[in-house]
Amino acid sequence: MAVFVISAGSITEQNGLITAHNVTGKKHKELFMSENILFKKYTPQDYVKFAEQTANWIKTTGKIGKTGKLWLQSPDSKENFDDYPMLTPKSLYGGSAGVGLFYLRLYQVTKNAEYLDEAESAAKEIISTYEGKAFYERTLNLKATEDKLVHVKNMPGWIAGFNNGPTGQAYFILKLYEITKDEAYISFARKVADDVISVAKTKDDGIYWSEQLDYCGDGSYIPYFAELYRITKDEKYVDAARKFGNYLLTKGKPAPNGGTYWNVVDLTIIDFPKDVFWVNLAHGTSGVGFVFALIYNLTKDEKFLNAAKEAAKYIQGIAVGDENAVLVPYLDSLERGPSTEFYYLSQCHGPAGTSLLFHALYDITGEKEYFDWVLKLSRGIIKAGAPENFSRGYWQSQALCCGTPGLLEHFVSVYKLTGDKEFLEYAERTAKTVVGQSFVEDADGDIYHQKNARRWSGAWWRTIPTDVHSYTGLYIGTAGNAWTLLSLAAAQNGEKLIETVEYDFFK
């Protein structure tokens, strides 16, 4: 019991019951002190509630397509995203496939058929408007644009790849098949993979599709082939992965500090200096190494495992930190060395993404070195001041790709790997930050209460911090924030849910 002395007497508190006394000891009145909402420690039920509030907001952005459902990529932006890489209407990254995947996961958690209906409506639109091989024939031969803000349009491999193109959409539909067992879904998923393979270019004993060989470009087809092989056991998907791996092996070069690096994207196309190259997932060596690990899992060919290990050695050779915590620079250069004053922290370009390579190698080899590096990279995020403090490469994007939700997904994964409460505590801290960055409007005519719809607004472009919008999508915006809250709730409850493809291969 706490006693508070006041000028006219005292106040006592016990079990939330407040009693005021005057100087003679006589009680004035009794009040019940309710729990302060800002002091609350969130529970799994809270995270599910927040996710359902998110679904309510996304519903307000819905629109009818030719046969099914789409959602506005950003209802408060005036930009046209129809040909905007990563944000095209049906993309997994920022379009309807990602929103549909979120609704499917929410259906798993709640068993509310309305969410499954939303997911299936998204799938119907994707399937009915699929272009087939014509999409690749058009996309992989696009002419360059001079628009400097969107010069990612000059990267055909990214436009055709998993995050933006049909394979990412088909991943969502493959997950629908796993839950519903509707044969139409697996048929579509196979059709998409077969079309990708049919348009591959052949060189020596390998295949490729574009000049962008990274995990965002040609390399992104490999996790999709791996997913499809797991279900169908069709060896043609293994064969395609092997052939691409053979081609990718030829692009590696010895690194000055050990290991092998892969510079597989020409960054001058997007106005970077010609001497620099990216290091981390999704565009650099750690992403390539992750692809090699997946190819090894499919083929059991040791040369691909060795390549993944070489990629890890390169990352270890340029990492900066101590025995407990490290970060990996954003850029490297054979002329200037690594950018030791510039670090991203989340999934794209940061330790949340690069740790996937070490996690995969630990799963394959059981070697403690790789396990330890997962922990070092994870602790590096915390030592950098995240999740609460932002920095040059960790800004308020509110994106699963490059913001706080990407950290939450990572910490949940490391907690599941280790069972260590240290990483659960990191996840819970990060979840509080994620929730704290969301916005819920005041109820109409009632400032004491709020509406039941939650969204996030962020600056997707690191270099344009004032370009803030609410995005609906999975990797760019609101759906992704709620997705990661469901990840934490599932980990706390010991439940298994569908995963994004990056986390779908771990034991």
Regions found by a protein language model. Give the residues of each.
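Extreme N-terminal basic, low-complexity initiation segments
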Residues: 2-8
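Short hydrophobic alpha-helical segments enriched in small aliphatic residues
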Residues: 5, 16, 22-23
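Glycan-recognition and catalytic cores of secretory/periplasmic carbohydrate-active enzymes
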Residues: 14, 32-507
